[in-house]
Each structure stands twice: as C-alpha cells, then as structure tokens.
C-alpha cells in the first residue's frame, strides 16, 4: 500500500511540475532527433531506441539524466547540452503522442517463447505492465529493437547504465547471456 501511495504521489508531483503540453513545439524540436530516432520517433536503426509511444515522464527523465550526466551515451551529448527543461518536456510530449510502428525484426519463436517464460519468472510486468507498454518512469519495451533491448540489459548487468534506482540492475544481474538474448527476441516481437 505504501509503495502504491508513493508512486501516485510521485506521478502527481511530476504532473504538477510539468508545463502545458506543446506537441507542436516538440515536433519542431524533434527534427534534430530524426537522423537517429527516425520520423516521429520510429527509429529504423536497431541500435537507437524507438521513442514513439514512450511515456512522457520516461522520455523527460531520460533526457534530463543525459543532460545531467546520470546516463551516458556520447552520441546524445551534443543534443542534450542546450536543451532547457521546457524543451525536454516538449520533446517528451511529442514522442509520447506518436504511434509505434512495427519493425522488420522477425523473432526466433523458440527464443521468444523462452523470453516470455523468463519475463514471467522475473516478474517484468510488475513494472513494465502487461503488454510491456510501460508506465510513468518505466519504459515501453514492447516492440523495441532487439539490439537495443539486448544492449540495455547488458549495460544494466555490467553497471554501464545505472540511472534506474537499482531496479533493473538487480534484475539484469540474474540474467544469463541466453536469457538476455531470449528476452530481446520476445520483447522485439510484441506490438
């Protein structure tokens, strides 16, 4: 009960602190993101995440973490340095409003079945929700690029990525390389 109250309080505080939605301003600002993240946040390059359909809170917090150095990705540095808080919210509102497009990735059915089983064993839907659509600061991982999912899980496991309050790090440490590969196949095949 306490955890639910804390999550609701955090979401309410975030909503109160957010400026008014300006998807049009976000669309204009997102022009700088197209080369890597694709039109409307639907990246066609598997090493870059699909931003379309992510939650506003998740996109904003990731941009803030990149800007403040809590999350590191050299390719993002030049883009986030000049972003204001308002810019980050505009981008977050824009990407959250976009429709996710399927990728051409074809998951291996055997690996995807093992990935489903592993996701149930590790209780992934406790945070990412049923359908893996994400919530609040938890990302949508359904339909995300296989390569990106695998890299992020490995980065959490090896502590290259730590901007998650330890939740994903704790889970990823329990995963074998095969588990990570299987989860990548499973998640990339969801829409």
Name each model feature, range by range:
Residues 9-20:
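Hydrophobic h-region of N-terminal signal peptides that target proteins for export
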Residues 23, 27, 41-72, 77-83, ...:
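Gly/Gly-Pro-rich "capping" loops immediately C-terminal to redox-active cysteine motifs
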Residues 81-103, 147, 173-191:
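C-terminal capping alpha-helices of c-type cytochrome domains
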Residues 21-40, 103, 107-130, 145:
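Sequence/structural segment immediately N-terminal to covalent heme-attachment motifs in c-type
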Residues 66, 94-95, 119, 156, ...:
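Conserved hydrophobic/aromatic "anchor" residues
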Residues 1-7:
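Bacterial N-terminal signal peptides that target proteins for export
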